[in-house]
Amino acid sequence: MNSRVFNFGAGPAMLPEEILKEAQEEFLNWRNTGMSILEIGHRTPEIISLLSTAEQSLRELLNIPKNYHVLFLGGAARTQFAMIPMNLLRPGDDAAYFITGIWSKMAYHEANLLKKAYYLSSEEKEGFVSIPDYQKWELKSNTAYVYYTPNETINGVRFPYVPKTGGVPLVADMTSCLLSEPININQYGLIFAGAQKNIANAGLTVVIIHEELLKNQPEPVIPTMLNYKNHAEHRSLYATPPVFNCYLASKMFEWIKTQGGIEGLFQRNCLKAAKLYQYLDSTDFYLTPVFKEARSIMNICFSLCYPDLEHKFLDMANERGLKALKGHRFTGGLRASLYNAMPMAGVDALIEFMSEFAKENG
């Protein structure tokens, strides 16, 4: 009997069952080494080959040019909130931030602790339910980079466009959207993403950075573990990388190719999100706060018109195998995350349950 459930959690997220089974089969004896992937030294030929293969697969999926470095770094994506200003801001520089949700707000405050940052737009007063109007902002002349979060995981808000910066490097936190939709790498100076949404398990952060941003490092000297140039020169092997995460990521990259690539997954993701939003818009029992033009494809936030029924909703959903639908602690409410590994069957099961719950409790 298959005991797998539909995990709608914002991260760690659902992984394809076939990848989990492959990892299970290989766990005790990886590539006939007689060792688990967890036991093999990170400077062995096997692991160096694994990292090289993972990087090449990611480059193929995203069409990453040669003048960009791909880094596989250990730790939380939140570390990048500090690494970015430390590496990219020189004395006298400013950084510009779009504050469109909780994560971009945190990144802005971290940058301000370390260096000098200002915000181009803040949607907080309206409750983080919208995106700033296209190109209605003005950059300071000393702006070293522009930072934005294309998809706000907590608030369920998505940029429907890529901000124009007039040649100033664009930095993007793509933790919850990298590999879910096509992007043009050349539009960005730096992209980073925590792995626990669409890439692998928690503990790995992928960084894609243009080589020009590694030059003219600011003073004082950046600590070596927080220095992008150092990690690039050592090909992500300056310290022990999160090998198992990279192993799963490599499998995920290959899996994406079998799903029609990123374009194929994007079409599927759009259909999944559209189906759930269509249901939400058809009933007064559920409320969706985000403006339609700013709705996330990955993270669908909603609430009940009777908030006191929320615990009952979650308990009954759990019994039906619909897990992790509780919203973030900062926002409350409910949230269904529809990452790459979530099948349409999961969306159908959720809508069926929500419809039944509304009829019984409306």
Swiss-Prot record:
Keywords: Amino-acid biosynthesis, Aminotransferase, Cytoplasm, Pyridoxal phosphate, Pyridoxine biosynthesis, Serine biosynthesis, Transferase. SUPFAM superfamilies: PLP-dependent transferases. InterPro entries: Aminotrans_V_dom, Aminotrans_V_PyrdxlP_BS, Pser_aminoTfrase, PyrdxlP-dep_Trfase, PyrdxlP-dep_Trfase_major, PyrdxlP-dep_Trfase_small. Its cofactor is pyridoxal 5'-phosphate. It is an enzyme of class 2 (transferase). It is found in: Cytoplasm. It holds the Pfam family Aminotran_5. Its main location: cytoplasm. GO terms for biological process: L-serine biosynthetic process; pyridoxine biosynthetic process. It catalyses: O-phospho-L-serine + 2-oxoglutarate = 3-phosphooxypyruvate + L-glutamate; 4-(phosphooxy)-L-threonine + 2-oxoglutarate = (R)-3-hydroxy-2-oxo-4-phosphooxybutanoate + L-glutamate. PROSITE patterns: AA_TRANSFER_CLASS_5. The modification N6-(pyridoxal phosphate)lysine is found at K197. Transmembrane segments: none annotated. PANTHER family: PHOSPHOSERINE AMINOTRANSFERASE (PTHR43247:SF1). This is Phosphoserine aminotransferase. It comes from Legionella pneumophila (strain Lens). The lineage of its organism: Bacteria, Pseudomonadati, Pseudomonadota, Gammaproteobacteria, Legionellales. The gene is serC.
